[in-house]
Structures are given as structure tokens and as C-alpha cells.
Design a protein with these regions (language model features):
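Active-site C-terminal subdomain of aminotransferase-like
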Residues: 1-94
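Conserved C-terminal alpha-helix-loop-beta "cap" of PLP-dependent enzymes
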Residues: 72, 76-144
Length: 147
């Protein structure tokens, strides 16, 4: 399965590939579970546009690595894993709780989301630029220095 939303910019949708038997079984499960939509053309159009964004996924991953490496080298916070294989960066916020970390981060103009009591998740995607990564790193660095 290949997801078209999030990083690729579509509001919803995925592509499922497989053998004829697999796809027939998937269709059956979809019907049994109440899936399916009528008038889905507008969403399909967004999916077609998202497919054109596939070449940019490597940029999302490059930015995630830049963010992770910057946090690790310039702040007291740790990142797990240190070299993210995807566009998600998980930050260990200790000695702060995730809520305190997020509150302080927001005071520098950067928003993120808690991912547990002492972890925060940051995600790069189609709408995150290199300048945004630099801003986030600057904010996290200031936050770290203030501790």
C-alpha cells in the first residue's frame, strides 16, 4: 500500500497493488467493512496531483535528517532514531515534559505535537521548507540554551 496523503499533499487516499486475487479479496473486505465512496472524483483528482509529488519525498527525508542531526549536535535533546529513515523525527524532551517543551517551542513560533509524556514528534512534508527547518532548529536551540 502506498499512502497519497500527508507528505504527498492529498487530503486522503492510498494506492493498493497486488495480484488479481489479492485485489479481489481487498475489494470484498472493503465492501464488508462499509468502505467505498460515491462521487469520489474530487479526491481522485487530488490523488493524481499527489502522484506528481513523489520525487519530492526524498527532500522530506533529507529535511528530517537535517532536523535530527541539528537537534543532536546543537541541543541537549536526543532524537530517536538519530538518523530517521522516514520524514518523522521523534525528540526526547527530557528534562522537560512534552507539554512544557511544546509550550516553550510555541513561544518561539514553532508548533509540534506530543508523542508521549517526554517525546515530541516533528514531521517534514510537502509544505515544510529548508527555511522552516532552520527556524525550528533555531527555536529548539534557544529552548535548550534557556534550560
Amino acid at each position: 500500500m502506498f499512502c497519497l496523503s500527508k507528505g504527498l499533499g492529498a487530503p486522503v487516499g492510498s494506492i493498493l497493488a497486488g495480484s488479481v486475487a489479492f485485489i479481489e479479496r481487498a475489494r470484498r473486505y472493503r465492501k464488508v467493512l462499509g468502505g467505498g465512496m460515491r462521487q469520489a472524483g474530487i479526491l481522485a483528482a487530488a490523488g493524481l496531483i499527489a502522484l506528481k509529488h513523489i520525487p519530492y519525498l526524498s527532500e522530506d527525508h533529507r529535511r528530517a535528517i537535517k532536523l535530527a542531526e541539528g537537534i543532536t549536535s546543537r541541543t541537549i535533546f536526543k532524537v530517536s532514531p538519530s538518523h530517521p529513515p522516514t520524514n518523522m523525527v521523534i525528540i526526547d524532551t527530557e528534562p522537560l515534559s512534552s507539554d512544557e517543551f511544546l509550550s516553550r517551542l510555541e513561544s518561539y513560533g514553532v508548533k509540534s505535537i506530543a508523542f508521549g509524556e517526554n517525546r515530541v514528534r516533528m514531521v517534514t512534508h510537502l509544505d515544510v521548507s529548508d527555511d522552516d527547518i532552520d527556524s525550528a532548529l533555531g527555536a529548539i536551540e534557544k529552548l535548550s540554551r534557556d534550560l
